């Protein structure tokens, strides 16, 4: 039997001696993490309940009916620095721009590092004795690291005063509505929760502030984070449970929630159409 050497990828015929642009050639590099600014003047002890949810659940909290009041916002910033290029060890005997027109000549690069700042802010609302944290998820423009750091900041602040915590979210990896507490998990493998709500539950269950009492309501959905679609039956269950947990008037509250959900087109089948 003859064994012949072969490669998955063909080797190039010509190898160019390109100068090293980066000092660190390893795959793992130390990267910055977002900084979260929590409102300093927020008086958390005066609230007995804290609701943590995402923007897709905003129809559950009608502004006019509940008289929502904006009391601050959570700001998060991420500063990314472009490292300065290393100094060249010698002069080239050829023209750099001619051989590498799309590359940057290290000899002509300034020593100063460029900084790029990414920032997002999310409002905090209140109604009665309840705080409302509503995080906007968008897998296109907002990295998951922002949600992870925001959830850590929120739970660490609430852990100092231990209010009743209610978490409301969605997941496309569950088959039916799930109600969970600190002592009971109704998820059945391979069901799981991701995104901002998954990060919040992680902080409540295994994070530094674990042990807090909470109730969690997760509805099945379709679509990526930030663009979820819910069924009308699941919306009815959400409205009933939220109205029961928060003590809202059933008839008027449910009517307003359904109206807002249809306006936001968050319901599967709320707006029927035909793809052409």
UniProtKB/Swiss-Prot annotation:
GO cellular component: cytoplasm
Localization of this protein: Cytoplasm
Keyword Chaperone: yes
TM region positions: none
Stored Pfam families: POC1
Keyword Cell membrane: no
A GO BP entry: proteasome assembly
Keywords per UniProt: Chaperone, Cytoplasm
InterPro entries per record: Pba1_sf, Psome_chaperone_1_fun
Additional observations: Present with 1350 molecules/cell in log phase SD medium.
Family: Belongs to the PSMG1 family.
UniProt function note: Involved in 20S proteasome assembly.
Protein name: Proteasome chaperone 1
Originating organism: Saccharomyces cerevisiae (strain ATCC 204508 / S288c)
């Amino acid at each position: 039997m003859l064994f012949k050497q072969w490669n998955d990828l063909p080797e190039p015929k010509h190898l160019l001696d390109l100068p090293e642009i980066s000092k660190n050639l390893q795959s793992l590099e130390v990267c910055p993490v977002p900084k979260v600014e929590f409102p300093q003047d927020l008086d958390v002890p005066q609230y007995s309940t804290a609701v943590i949810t995402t923007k897709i659940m905003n129809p559950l909290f009608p502004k006019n009916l509940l008289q929502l009041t904006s009391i601050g916002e959570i700001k998060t910033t991420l500063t990314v620095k472009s490292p300065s290029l290393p100094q060249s060890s010698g002069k080239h005997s050829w023209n750099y721009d001619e051989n590498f027109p799309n590359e940057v000549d290290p000899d002509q690069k300034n020593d100063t590092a460029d900084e790029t700042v990414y920032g997002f802010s999310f409002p905090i609302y209140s109604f009665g004795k309840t705080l409302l944290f509503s995080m906007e998820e968008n897998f296109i423009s907002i990295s998951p690291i922002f949600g992870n750091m925001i959830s850590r900041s929120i739970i660490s602040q609430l852990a100092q005063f231990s209010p009743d915590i209610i978490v409301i979210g969605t997941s496309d990896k569950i088959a039916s509505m799930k109600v969970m507490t600190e002592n009971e998990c109704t998820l059945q493998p391979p069901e799981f929760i991701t995104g901002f709500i998954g990060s919040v539950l992680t902080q409540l269950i295994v994070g530094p502030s674990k042990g807090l009492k909470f109730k969690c309501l997760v509805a099945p959905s379709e679509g990526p984070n930030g663009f979820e679609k819910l069924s009308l039956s699941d919306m009815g269950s959400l409205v009933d449970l939220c109205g029961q947990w928060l003590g809202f008037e059933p008839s008027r509250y449910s009517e307003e929630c359904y109206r807002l959900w249809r306006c936001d087109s968050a319901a599967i089948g709320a707006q029927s159409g035909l793809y052409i």
